[in-house]
């Protein structure tokens, strides 16, 4: 199965995405990661106001197969979290690049986005597998 990814998204090696929207960055996990996890049953996210370091664990996603940590693709302050995904983890599974987003961050260093893979590079990486 070949995966397609929104062109504006940037991706970490650990399959989290960052999508800049003005001064904020929306964070989630890729459709590839969701597919690998299988049926998602629980999502744990940080609280609004928490500060995240780039590469640091910011929560976990539990599926019938495994529990996986998620890592911040950029450093910043959590300004919003997706309560709908917390209440209904299947939202993440149904639309990981849309309604299944996880966090909105105010990045402390927006230039960190440039170090992430663009959608084409990430797509080549995961589709080659």
Curated annotation (Swiss-Prot):
UniProt entry tagged with the keyword Amino-acid biosynthesis: no
Naturally occurring in which organism (per UniProt): Parasynechococcus marenigrum (strain WH8102)
UniProt modified residues of type N6-lipoyllysine: 65
The protein, known as: Glycine cleavage system H protein
Keywords, in A-Z order: Lipoyl
Protein family according to the UniProt entry: Belongs to the GcvH family.
Protein origin, superkingdom: Bacteria
Segments crossing the lipid bilayer: none
Domain Lipoyl-binding: 24-106
Cofactor: (R)-lipoate
Pfam families per the UniProt record, alphabetical: GCV_H
Gene name of the encoded protein: gcvH
